[in-house]
């Protein structure tokens, strides 16, 4: 996932983390301590804390199905793939198959192992990838909200009260954008 990824690509990435690794845990460094985190828990807490929902209805449906089963099964328990592969919506089935099989073509070469070249483990990849994907997604949502509000400022029929409200919200969103930008810098470095 790159900083220039679209919000839809980031939604897909977050769904991939849920479907493939939602039951897995990783350690995230906070200050000097390592904090154990569950992939699904981190994604749901981050989305819920800001009241975010996926804009792509297909990914939102997969997210809702996963969340429903996750609540029943509990944290750390793998949500069986059949909930997605046998979903009543054929588009959810197709997208799930595509996501679940997308990375299966990549296997570390035996040459790498013989030469002692470090191959990143799933846990190492999750510790960076999950927080980064969630943060980048939040950034894209904030950018879209700012753009929408800036469009409203250009409206000639906007009242003074609405104008003050829009400017106030723009200021708040820009502060969040700066916070996210700082966080992304830390995640990438």
Predicted regions and their residues:
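Non-catalytic protein-protein interaction segments used by genome-maintenance enzymes to assemble
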Residues: 1-82, 94-98, 102-110, 142-146
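Bacterial replisome coupling helices
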Residues: 63-189
């Amino acid at each position: 996932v790159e900083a220039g990824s679209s919000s839809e690509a980031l939604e897909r990435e977050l769904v991939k983390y849920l479907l493939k690794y939602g039951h897995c845990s990783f350690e995230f460094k906070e200050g000097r301590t390592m904090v154990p985190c569950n992939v699904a828990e981190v994604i749901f807490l981050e989305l819920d804390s800001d009241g975010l929902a996926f804009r792509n209805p297909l990914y939102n449906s997969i997210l809702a199905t996963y969340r429903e089963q996750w609540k029943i099964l509990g944290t750390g328990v793998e949500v069986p793939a059949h909930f997605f592969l046998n979903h009543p919506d054929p588009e959810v089935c197709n997208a799930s198959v595509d996501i679940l099989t997308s990375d299966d073509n990549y296997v570390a070469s035996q040459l790498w192992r013989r030469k002692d070249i470090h191959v990143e483990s799933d846990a190492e990849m999750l510790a960076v990838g999950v927080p980064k994907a969630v943060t980048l997604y939040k950034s894209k949502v904030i950018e879209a909200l700012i753009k929408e509000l800036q469009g409203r400022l250009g409206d000639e029929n906007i009242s003074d009260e609405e104008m003050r409200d829009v400017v106030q919200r723009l200021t708040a969103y820009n502060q969040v954008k700066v916070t996210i930008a700082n966080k992304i810098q830390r995640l990438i470095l």
